[in-house]
Amino acid sequence: MDYEFKKNTLEGTYHANFSMGHEAMGRWLVEDVAKNTDLLAEIYKHIALIKNTQDEWTLSGKVMTLVLSDQEVIVQENALFEQSDEEFEEDIHMYDDECISVCGLEDFETMLQSWEAFINRF
């Protein structure tokens, strides 16, 4: 998973560009996390709790839903999360890389640390 963070200094907005298949991670960072360091601390806490367990933690944001497990992290649009599995299978043809992303827990934690370091610089 490759990514690049940018800040538009004229507008004060942040951008997170991710490699193909992980675009939803960027949307989640910009739209749901932004500069919320309290939220980042809460996510780090749950990452530590979930490691080496089979627990799962879900966080519904304004636009996206984050699902943490010991194996993977899923970020998806709230509308997709609210669908049942059966509805999801029927609508899979509408899949869009910007709607859902999956990565490993360690990669996610590393990316989150990079985002935090980036926003703290500005």
From Swiss-Prot:
Superkingdom to which the source organism belongs: Bacteria
A Pfam family matched in the record: UPF0231
Residues spanning the signal sequence: none
Record-linked InterPro entries: UPF0231
Family: Belongs to the UPF0231 family.
Protein name per Swiss-Prot or TrEMBL: UPF0231 protein VF_2154
Native source organism of the sequence: Aliivibrio fischeri (strain ATCC 700601 / ES114)
